[in-house]
Amino acid sequence: MDISDFDFTLPEKLIAQHPPEVRGSSRLLVALPDMPLQDRVFGDLPDYVEAGDVLVFNNTKVMKARLFGQKDSGGRIEALIERVLDNHTALAHIRSSKSPKPGMGLVFEGGIRAVTVGREGELFCLRFEGGETVYELLEQNGHLPLPPYIERAADADDDSRYQTVYAKYQGAVAAPTAGLHFTEELLHRLKDKGAVTAEVTLHVGAGTFQPVRVDKIEEHKMHSEWFEVPSETAAAVEAAKARGNKVWAVGTTSMRALESAARATGRLKAGQGDTDIFITPGYRFNVVDRLVTNFHLPKSTLLMLVSAFSGMGHIRAAYRHAVEREYRFFSYGDAMVLGRNEGVVR
């Protein structure tokens, strides 16, 4: 398929630069199969969830992954931690006038010292000195890495608003943004209705913002991210399917974790590992029936994912409606509910 099939015109004013004033107050476009588009608010989500349905959340937590400093040679440097390997070692994207050489010392804010000890592709392996762990150093001295389309520096408000209320495990460099709309009160309402909540972990990497640079999407190489599906979640999903209930993925990262864990057999299995799953039109979904997601960038892999899930024509119509009604787009923007289109050619 051609990348131009996933392009659309988006007025710049619709790109949300700040979160809504109150968490959970965003708009919700309900775009389920076989029903007209509905303009709602996010607090109406329980209206579409049945007792016994399972909602699967990604419990990853965004690290303060951006560090500023200088090389021992004096040049300025910026590091974005992509993955923590152990208590003192991490892989990082490096921005500098010249790439650091193996063995070069780096000094970051707060007196953090690190040494480059190798490379893995475009990533540099950094070994941090001192007794504190990488996570502790980042929490004390790092900066929250907002997406590139948010054209401002992170502030104190982002420290809480760019995290979900259920975030547990550090490791992401970008938030699972569909989850940003959920409040504790809404989670209680869903449970009171009889919905089941379950969790996966997928540490969102910087590759989520990587543009597709090829004309034919089949030639695109997807980035890899670490994920885990606990046994309790696999059991909850299988039980829901057995009784005829729906499985909801809260966000594309939850969907990618679930579908990755079902790749081998077509049934969800507990486990962990790295995934580079690339979901495009023609993909056969094994787990997810409903998807809560934000609005995605033109020509992005996530727009391809939702097009695979609900059908390209359906997504085009929904996005055209969203632009006309001036929904807010991307990480701090509004949300939509999508259903799996069983009529999609697979």
UniProtKB/Swiss-Prot annotation:
Gene3D superfamilies: QueA-like
Keyword Transferase: yes
Pathway assignment: tRNA modification; tRNA-queuosine biosynthesis
Major place of residence: cytoplasm
Compartment(s) where it occurs, according to its Swiss-Prot or TrEMBL record: Cytoplasm
Keywords: Cytoplasm, Queuosine biosynthesis, S-adenosyl-L-methionine, Transferase
Reactions accelerated catalytically: 7-aminomethyl-7-carbaguanosine(34) in tRNA + S-adenosyl-L-methionine = epoxyqueuosine(34) in tRNA + adenine + L-methionine + 2 H(+)
InterPro entries: QueA (IPR003699), QueA_dom1 (IPR042118), QueA_dom2 (IPR042119), QueA_sf (IPR036100)
One Gene Ontology cellular component: cytoplasm
EC number: 2.4.99.17
Listed GO biological process terms: queuosine biosynthetic process; tRNA wobble guanine modification
Entry keyword S-adenosyl-L-methionine: yes
A molecular-function term among this protein's GO annotations: S-adenosylmethionine:tRNA ribosyltransferase-isomerase activity
Similarity comment text for this entry: Belongs to the QueA family.
Record's function text: Transfers and isomerizes the ribose moiety from AdoMet to the 7-aminomethyl group of 7-deazaguanine (preQ1-tRNA) to give epoxyqueuosine (oQ-tRNA).
PANTHER family hit by this protein: S-ADENOSYLMETHIONINE:TRNA RIBOSYLTRANSFERASE-ISOMERASE
Summary of subunit composition and partner proteins: Monomer.
Name of the protein described by the UniProt record: S-adenosylmethionine:tRNA ribosyltransferase-isomerase
